[in-house]
UniProtKB/Swiss-Prot annotation:
<dbReference type="InterPro" id="IPR005704">
    <property type="entry name" value="Ribosomal_uS3_bac-typ"/>
</dbReference>
<feature type="domain" description="KH type-2">
    <location>
        <begin position="39"/>
        <end position="108"/>
    </location>
</feature>
<comment type="subunit">
    <text>Part of the 30S ribosomal subunit. Forms a tight complex with proteins S10 and S14.</text>
</comment>
<dbReference type="Pfam" id="PF07650">
    <property type="entry name" value="KH_2"/>
</dbReference>
<dbReference type="InterPro" id="IPR015946">
    <property type="entry name" value="KH_dom-like_a/b"/>
</dbReference>
<dbReference type="InterPro" id="IPR001351">
    <property type="entry name" value="Ribosomal_uS3_C"/>
</dbReference>
<dbReference type="InterPro" id="IPR018280">
    <property type="entry name" value="Ribosomal_uS3_CS"/>
</dbReference>
<comment type="function">
    <text>Binds the lower part of the 30S subunit head. Binds mRNA in the 70S ribosome, positioning it for translation.</text>
</comment>
<dbReference type="InterPro" id="IPR004087">
    <property type="entry name" value="KH_dom"/>
</dbReference>
<keyword id="KW-0687">Ribonucleoprotein</keyword>
<dbReference type="Pfam" id="PF00189">
    <property type="entry name" value="Ribosomal_S3_C"/>
</dbReference>
<keyword id="KW-0699">rRNA-binding</keyword>
<dbReference type="GO" id="GO:0022627">
    <property type="term" value="C:cytosolic small ribosomal subunit"/>
</dbReference>
<dbReference type="InterPro" id="IPR004044">
    <property type="entry name" value="KH_dom_type_2"/>
</dbReference>
<dbReference type="GO" id="GO:0019843">
    <property type="term" value="F:rRNA binding"/>
</dbReference>
<dbReference type="GO" id="GO:0003729">
    <property type="term" value="F:mRNA binding"/>
</dbReference>
<keyword id="KW-0689">Ribosomal protein</keyword>
Length: 212
């Protein structure tokens, strides 16, 4: 069961926080959900080179608070905060009548952020770096940064093979069924001339004993 369950979704409300925090009547729920997806996809597309790990959204009545976690906050903020102001104006056009607040959080150790690691591996594969080399390098960097365990998986027509297959490496522990285990998960897609490869990364950082 633990192999098939999303590592973050499995721990929501236990040691992980929801990426979107708001309440809405049943009739408006789907509308707000699509707005959230639109905001997140737009920000990730706009700041591809900034290493955006995740985007959190909190709604209180007509106020929308957007928190961007990125490895390169200077790119998102811009010179004298001009870029983040431009982003705010764009989001206000996307969500008319809403008061937008944007905060930028720096990911201080990107080697321990599963989403950023997955994106980096996918980028290297697209640049024709050996997938095994990229996977092993990511694992080494994560372990040096303090990870207790790392698992990396690449799936698809690896190296242009006729049949799709998956390859994975696991170093250290990966207690997927332990709720208190702080496991980060990331997914990215690599677009190659042979087709699409999926990259999945699990990083075990240790146990959380005092809840969130």
């Amino acid at each position: 069961m633990g192999q098939k369950t999303h590592p973050i979704g499995f721990r929501l409300g236990v040691i992980k926080e929801w990426p979107s925090k708001w309440y809405a009547p049943k009739k408006e729920y789907s509308k707000l959900l699509h707005e959230d997806l639109k905001i997140k996809n737009y920000i990730k597309e706009r700041y591809k080179v900034a290493g955006v790990s995740k985007v959190e959204i909190e709604r209180i009545v007509d106020k929308v608070r957007v928190k961007i976690h990125t490895a390169r906050p200077a790119i998102v903020i811009g010179r004298r905060g001009q870029e983040v102001e431009n982003l705010k104006k764009t989001l206000e056009k996307m969500l008319p009548g809403k008061e937008i607040t944007i905060s930028v959080v720096e990911v201080r150790v990107p080697e321990l952020d599963a989403q950023l690691v997955a994106q980096d591996i996918a980028t290297q594969i697209e640049r024709r770096v050996s997938h095994r080399r990229a996977m092993k390098r990511a694992i080494d960097n994560a372990l040096k940064a303090g990870a207790k365990g790392v698992k990396v998986q690449v799936k698809g027509r690896i190296g242009g093979a006729e049949l799709a297959r998956k390859e994975w490496f696991l170093v250290g522990r990966m207690p997927l069924q332990t709720l208190r285990a702080d496991i980060d998960y990331g997914f990215a897609t690599a677009y190659t001339k042979y087709g699409i490869l999926s990259v999945k990364v699990w990083i075990y950082k240790g146990d959380v004993l005092n809840g969130r």
